[in-house]
Amino acid sequence: MSFVNFNATFFIFIISFVFARIVMMLGNRTQHAFVNPVDLEDNSINCINTKYNKICWNDAYHAVHHNRPALHYTDIPGEFLKNKAFYVKQRTLPFEGIHFLHIFAWLMTRRYDKLVRNVVNIDNMFATDEEANALMKDRTKKMKADT
């Protein structure tokens, strides 16, 4: 397309593509940011009651997606509610009213206090906010490579 008009191609296609890729990479990194050091496959979160789910096919129910990848997007919220005891046992972090870019920004600025304010304490998974904060810090700390 640049043979037609380079400026139009650059601003409409190239910048949009690069911006979209960066946002998607930030989102993907955030979806898997809270790594359980005991079970490395247990690293996803759920964002519930957020506008993002309405426009992105319930993508923010990411832990549900990992457990049931073939589930139709309209069935994901019900699946989450049906299996909430499993997510409590796994200590999967459910955030309410925020999406991945909020979480990414607060992780990069170490604002765990803001993250804790948006954690849903399902079935009293956490005794205190400090316990939720400690879990988040534990799951985002630097891991040592196996030697």
PLM feature spans:
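Helix-coil boundary and interhelical linker segments in multi-pass alpha-helical membrane proteins
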Residues: 2-12
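Cytosolic/stromal cytosol-facing helical appendages immediately following the last transmembrane segment
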Residues: 13, 19-147
